[in-house]
Each structure stands twice: as structure tokens, then as C-alpha cells.
Amino acid sequence: MKAIDKYFFAGGKNMCTAATYKTKDFYFGRTLDYEFSYGNEIAITPRNYPFHFRHSDRVLDKHYAIIGMAHISDSYPLYYDAINEKGLGMAGLNFVGNAAYANPVSDKENIAQFEFIPWILSQCATLKEARRKLSCMNLTNTQFSENFPCAQLHWILADTSGCLVIESMKDGFHIYDNPVGVLTNNPPFPQQMFQLNNYQSLSPRQPKNTFAPGLELQSYSRGMGALGLPGDLSSASRFTKVAFTKMNSRSGDSELESVSQFFHILGSVDQQRGCCEVAENKYEITLYTSCCNAIKGIYYYNTYENHQINAVDMHRENLDTTALIRYPVLETQNILFQN
């Protein structure tokens, strides 16, 4: 395994953005931003796939099916983001410098960081059930293997009823309600939420002159109600921009309208090659964007090179099997000629 691969899994400072969206159905997805792709796949974990959780003698081979984007190693899905067949979604995003995990303890259920997503999604049908699971677990610093150190992450967990953020830090294991349904990277979630106070005057409507009512000022362009909305690629700015975009978003409630709108929401923080230099002649880009219809079990995605929306429907597969079902990520741009 290349050293840079190990760097990524250890928590290299890549940037990501996750969001939820609700119309008639519930949608959940994220961007994954990094300087190169190294072999992601869409992975369906069927109901009878045997999970051998690292700190348990029990094999979990009867559970909810899961679909998501993963790096697969030794037939194990290392999920970045996923939903289960019941409509619960979860994603891990980089949290470098703040994430800290515990040693195993005797009075709680010990769960390795790399198995956190499948541990929750395989057993919990709802956010309420997940809360109960979280209250009795201990997130450990156990590595997947020598080549896969613990990634420094925090997590967004959501269903149609609400959204949580989970952060394991040196000062403890924190679970936060997330009223905006958005997560990026640093700083910790309470600080991300607090910074929204700075932008409460922003609006999608044209501004009124409160600067000096006696002074004749003109709105010389559309969109001036959102002057001051951050536009850079830092994690704090992306949090604010996607929160504003999502909270003011309007769309129809059909599947096509909802999916299209979700990609537009996360598209507001797309990273273009050349705008975020991480080393000489190396640039972070949005490798992929996902959108899951958590109700229907459909995983939609596009990539930096292929902006066509592609989809895998978990319910078109036999979910009562034991082996992972794998689909390659379609990276080549697909253009529909009309003549």
C-alpha cells in the first residue's frame, strides 16, 4: 500500500461536506474531496453478510442491508457514507486534530472506529434506536490493519425524524442534535453552529436599506441579500454556505426534482482542480458527490470527471445473501448527444 494511501486513512486533511434534505422522501449524502481517487466502490452489504466485530465473539449475520460508498479490503466494506434498508444514513468526515478514540473498557460495548458505520446501520432502524446504541458504546482506537491506521473522523447520522453529530474527542464522547442537517470538518460542531450567528442577517430576498435609511442606496444586482455569505473552500465556510443553501432551498417533491436539487445543494461547495493546492502541482477536488434516497434505498452519485448522475438500487439485488455486492464507480464522462 502506498504511503499516501496510509496518509488518507490516517486522516489526511481532506475536506468533505455532508447534508440531509427532505421532500416527499428523505435524502442523505456527501462530497468527498481529495487529490486523487484510489479505488472506491458502491458496496451493498446484504442481510446475511457476516460481521465479525473486532471486540466481540459474536458473529452478526442477520441484520439490515446497507448500501454506500466504500473502500473494500479483504472483503470488508470500509464505508465513507451509507444508508440502510430502513432509511437511516451515516457518514464519516475528517476531523483531524480533534478526533480521539478510547482504549477498550469492560463496562461498555467496544466498537472500533472503522466499524462504526456498519455497527450502527446493521442494527438500528431509526435514529431513536441509534441513540440508545450510542449510549452504551465505547469507540476504540483499534486499527483495521497495519496499513489502515485510525482515520480521524466525526460522523453525521440521520433519518427522516432528525439528525445527530457524533464527535469522540479527548474530553469525551459527544452526541449533538443537528438542526441544520449539515456537517463539514473542523472546528467542532458546537463552534460551527455558533458561527451561524454571524450570518443571521443574510437572506435570499433583496435587502432593505438599514445602513442609513436617509441615504439613497440601490440594489444594483440580484442576490445582494446574501452579501457576506462565505465562498472560500475552508470547512467553516463550507458549513455556512451549505447550511444557507439547504435551509433556503426550494424544489418539487418528485424523485427527479429532489435528487437534482440535492446535487445542486452540495454543488455549491464543489472543489475545482486548481483552487485548493495541497502540494506542488497537486490539488484537492470533489472526487464524488452522493445522494441517497434513504426511503427507497437508492444510491445516486456523480464524480469529478463524470457529472452524469448514476444510481444503484439496493432493492434490485437479492439482499438475502452473504457476499458483498460491488459496483465500480463510473469515472468517464458520459455525454448525451442530441443529434
Predicted regions and their residues:
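Catalytic cofactor-binding cores of redox enzymes
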Residues: C136-H174
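Short hydrophobic/aromatic-rich beta-strand segments that constitute the beta-sheet cores
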Residues: M90-G92, I175, Y299-N302
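Short acidic-glycine loop/turn motifs at beta-strand connectors
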Residues: K22-D25, N84-K86, A158-G162, E167-G172, ...
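A contiguous strand-loop segment
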Residues: G11-K108, C136, N141, P328, ...
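C-terminus-biased signal that marks the final domain/tail of proteins
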Residues: F8-Y27, T142-S145, C150-A151, T160-G162, ...
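Short, surface-exposed beta-strand-loop junctions and turns on beta-sheet-rich folds
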Residues: Y34-F36, V96-N98, D171-H174, G181, ...
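Proteins synthesized as precursors that undergo proteolytic processing into mature forms
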Residues: D107-Q143, E255-F263
